[in-house]
Curated annotation (Swiss-Prot):
ANK repeats lie at residues 9-38, 42-79, 83-113, 117-146. Its main location: cytoplasm. The keyword Transmembrane does not apply. SMART domains: ANK. PANTHER family: ANK_REP_REGION DOMAIN-CONTAINING PROTEIN, ANKYRIN REPEAT DOMAIN-CONTAINING PROTEIN 34B. Belongs to the ANKRD34 family. The lineage of its organism: Eukaryota, Metazoa, Chordata, Craniata, Vertebrata. This is Ankyrin repeat domain-containing protein 34B. Coiled coil: none annotated. Keywords: ANK repeat, Cytoplasm, Nucleus, Repeat. It is found in: Cytoplasm; Nucleus. Residues 177-188 have a biased composition (Polar residues). One of its GO terms (cellular component) is nucleus.
Length: 521
């Protein structure tokens, strides 16, 4: 109460004069040009101060006389302060009396206006227990066609008095707790309102927190269809059949398909689609399935199933190969190496989900087989031939044994070195393809003439054969040791198309290199 009476009068002389009920000083200020609706830092006007003040001395006039004079000088009774209260609300709060309330109502004060807490002058009149003021307010509402249907006053759990008002709209039975929700009502049928709607006509001061939507006809519960009933909104009748289902699916996550069932169905479909794969490819598929449990569904590329089956048949006729652990590890653990593929598969595309997974798995197998074919065609040690090529392999193995033998190398004969170089050139594939590995071996331009070594990093697919005689003289004289040197980088513009990669060394190659260094060194 003391907080309501507290008034700030330092910044405005008119407010100070009204607060002290100095009628003559107020008249002089208004005639001198003071603004009658000027407010203080709380947004309170002189009319509000006149309704709140309780200052009485020998020079002050009555509250009714001061308010009447202010209203005659065009004071606005419907201005709201920073808390949303009007002069009529302040009059009801401070028990200004029925005469003051009548003056305000006659000057156009609106009894249905509400403050920021949702209370109107009617609520404050009920809480102040002023029957005469309440009767005047009810009569004013009836005169304006706003008949008050119900005003209830209860005590909350904390002991405070709470008042509800309903203007022009009869209260719904659901608000008073007479109706209970249907037994088949799901949580998605309950609408939760967290903030009150903006009040335009002040027809309701308090609404329900939970609003039960109209249930389906199968449940046997029908909401009120009255235009003013708060249990039904007009726009809900125009909603289609799919929208409520989608809203219920998003609001009730327990209705969705569990991820374990999707994963189980995915594994079964993969097993049905890929029955003729090799054990190494089956290992890579199992590693991919482990990655599916931690990531979204991934897609490598788009390919038709018919094309994939055709490619698989082509590679099966050409001959099966065995994958190395590095290839399986790089293709299964690091599927993000391809930047052009889409990252995730949307869950909304459920009809094409299993089809896309099987296609991506087939494509990954085809891609690994294609990579292996290129790998074996570029490596002279890993190339396998069938038919008449087997005889050439046996001859090359015999010549390799001759090379490892120290006798022809110690003699330094020109014929043995030339025979070895010719044999190596016959086995060399002219379509040079690089491979990647873990070791870094620097080779000179003569390295590609020796068997058992990887192809050099040259741009020209048909490199010129250097003169072997010069190096044979160096070997026979023994003045220089055969040390591998870094290849010269060509300066042709075509070199941009080649990707320089490192070579890998096997134990057999390391032994050959050590034998050569012992012999020539």
């Amino acid at each position: 109460m003391d907080e309501a009476v507290d008034v700030t009068t330092e910044s405005n002389s008119l407010i100070k004069a009204v607060y002290q009920s100095r009628l003559r000083l107020t008249r002089l200020l208004l005639e001198g040009g003071a603004y009658i609706n000027e407010s203080n830092d709380r947004g309170e006007t002189p009319l509000m101060i006149a309704c709140k003040t309780k200052h009485v001395d020998h020079q002050s006039v009555s509250k009714v006389k001061m308010i009447k004079y202010l209203l005659e000088n065009n004071a606005d009774p419907n201005i709201q302060d920073k808390f949303g209260k009007t002069a009529l609300m302040h009059a009801c709060l401070e028990n200004a009396g029925a005469e003051v309330v009548s003056l305000l109502l006659e000057s156009g004060a609106d009894p249905s206006l509400q403050d920021h807490t949702g209370f109107s002058a009617l609520v404050y009149a009920v809480n102040s227990e002023d029957k005469e003021t309440l009767r005047i307010l009810l009569n004013a509402c009836k005169a304006k066609g706003k008949e008050v249907i119900i005003i209830t006053k209860d005590k909350s759990a904390s002991g405070k008095q709470t008042t509800r008002q309903y203007l022009n709209v009869p209260p719904s039975p659901g608000i008073e707790g007479n109706n209970s929700p249907s037994p088949c009502t799901s949580p998605s049928d309950i609408e939760l309102k967290t903030s009150p709607a903006p009040i335009s006509n002040a027809l309701e001061t308090e609404k329900e927190l939970f609003n039960f939507k109209e249930a389906a006809s199968s449940c046997g519960f029908k909401g009120s269809s009255q235009p003013g009933s708060p249990t039904k909104k007009p726009h809900l009748s125009h909603v289609g059949g799919k929208l409520p289902l989608l809203q219920r699916l998003h609001s009730e996550p327990w209705l969705k398909i569990p991820p374990s069932l999707l994963h189980q169905h995915k594994v079964s479909s993969l097993q049905e689609e890929l029955q003729d794969i090799t054990p190494d490819e089956e290992l890579s598929l199992q590693m991919n399935e482990l990655m599916f449990s931690k990531r979204y569904f991934t897609r490598h590329q788009s390919i038709d199933v018919k094309d994939a089956s055709h490619l698989l048949k082509t590679f099966d006729t050409a001959g099966a190969r065995k994958l190395s652990y590095d290839e399986i590890h790089s293709h299964s653990i690091y599927p993000e190496a391809n930047p052009n593929r889409p990252e995730t598969l949307p869950v909304d595309q459920e009809p094409d989900l299993m089809h896309s997974i099987s296609v991506s798995s087939l494509k990954s197998i085809v891609q690994r087989r294609n990579l292996g074919a290129n790998h074996y065609s570029s490596d002279s040690q890993l190339t396998t031939r069938a038919g008449p090529a087997a005889a050439e392999d046996s001859k090359s193995l015999l010549e390799k044994k001759k090379m490892l033998c120290p006798q022809p190398l110690l003699t330094g004969s020109r014929e043995s070195l030339e025979s070895i170089s010719v044999t190596a050139l016959s086995r060399r594939n002219h379509a040079i393809l690089e491979r990647r590995g873990s070791g870094a071996l620097l080779l000179d331009h003569i390295a590609h003439t020796r068997p058992g070594f990887l192809p050099p990093l040259n741009v020209n697919p048909h490199p010129p054969i250097p003169d072997i005689s010069i190096h044979s003289k160096l070997i026979s004289s023994g003045t220089k040791s055969l040390i591998p040197s870094a290849p010269h980088v060509p300066k042709e513009p075509k070199s941009k198309k080649m990707l320089l990669r490192r070579h890998s060394m096997h134990t057999e190659q390391i032994k050959q290199l050590m034998n050569l260094e012992e012999i020539f060194g």
